[in-house]
Amino acid sequence: MTQPTIEDTLLRLAAVIDSRKGGDPEQSYVSRLFHKGDDAVLKKIGEEATEVVLAAKDVRQGGAPSALVGEVADLWFHCLVALSHFDLSPADVIAELERREGMSGIEEKALRKRREREENGG
């Protein structure tokens, strides 16, 4: 039996998250976030990102790496919720990462700035 890929896992989890749209906010945490709207979804990402930073600092001070893994999992989960909330999917992010693959960060940033100038008529 073959191991599922990271992409398979993300897409499967995204499908579960998508299925919570319009669900009962009393029965599902994700449905509750969707029901509360943009601010609630985005606030959770900020909270989880802060927890990732704190857990990473703890690892540097001898803390458990598993705590960092758990916090990153929470952040990824809430990012998947945000993607779904804005009618996007992990496939959109994966496509963007694949587009950037093999390109230096400096080169990618310069291309992005040039594209933004062109879109803004400058």
UniProtKB/Swiss-Prot annotation:
An example molecular function term from Gene Ontology annotations: phosphoribosyl-ATP diphosphatase activity
Superkingdom to which the source organism belongs: Bacteria
UniProt entry keywords in alphabetical sequence: Amino-acid biosynthesis, ATP-binding, Cytoplasm, Histidine biosynthesis, Hydrolase, Nucleotide-binding
Keyword Methyltransferase assigned: no
Enzyme class: hydrolase
Compartment(s): Cytoplasm
Swiss-Prot/TrEMBL catalytic activity: 1-(5-phospho-beta-D-ribosyl)-ATP + H2O = 1-(5-phospho-beta-D-ribosyl)-5'-AMP + diphosphate + H(+)
GO biological process terms held by the UniProt record: L-histidine biosynthetic process
EC number: 3.6.1.31
Pathway: Amino-acid biosynthesis; L-histidine biosynthesis; L-histidine from 5-phospho-alpha-D-ribose 1-diphosphate: step 2/9
A Pfam short name: PRA-PH
GO CC term, one of those recorded: cytoplasm
Family stated for the protein in its record: Belongs to the PRA-PH family.
Protein name: Phosphoribosyl-ATP pyrophosphatase
Lineage, top ranks: Bacteria, Pseudomonadati, Pseudomonadota, Betaproteobacteria, Burkholderiales
